[in-house]
């Protein structure tokens, strides 16, 4: 369960999503055997939206890759739901978790914005 290639926490460098996706894919292509069936990304400190958007972009730009690319997010999947939970909003919690799960599913097949 890797993270995407991102600047370090202390870096002020701004990198476009397309460059993050390219560097991540290049690192995977160089180091992960094609026999590996799938790679499940951690969010690696990315916010919920960015984690999903970048996973989606990976799957859109590289549709013929050797492995399935998906998510294994904890914080990025639960963050919105936990905010609702902290306010005692059970219905909001359920809706937020369902929305985030659907978004990440769509990102894992490159269909987030379709």
Across the structure, where does each feature detected by a protein language model lie?
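Active-site capping/gating regions of soluble enzymes
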Residues: 1-114
